[in-house]
């Protein structure tokens, strides 16, 4: 059986990258929460 995680850097950036997060309202909320939490990395 094929495993679910097949890593690809391009897809990783395109779906979870900073610019993608900034594009939507929800994504900006994610970044805001991560800033408040004090995350070292806000996005991939």
Curated annotation (Swiss-Prot):
A GO CC annotation given for this chain: ribonucleoprotein complex
InterPro entries the UniProt entry points to: Ribosomal_bL34, Ribosomal_bL34_CS
Pfam families for the chain: Ribosomal_L34 (PF00468)
GO process annotations (BP): translation
Domain of life: Bacteria
Keyword Ribonucleoprotein annotated: yes
MF term (GO), any: structural constituent of ribosome
Keywords: Ribonucleoprotein, Ribosomal protein
Keyword Ribonucleoprotein tagged: yes
NCBIfam families given in the database record: rpmH_bact
Family per record: Belongs to the bacterial ribosomal protein bL34 family.
Name of the featured protein: Large ribosomal subunit protein bL34
Biological classification of the source: Bacteria, Bacillati, Bacillota, Bacillota incertae sedis, Caldicellulosiruptorales
Gene: rpmH
């Amino acid at each position: 059986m094929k495993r679910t995680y097949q890593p690809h850097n391009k897809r990783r950036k395109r779906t979870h990258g900073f610019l993608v997060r900034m594009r939507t309202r929800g994504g900006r909320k994610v970044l805001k929460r991560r800033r408040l939490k004090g995350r070292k990395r806000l996005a991939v």
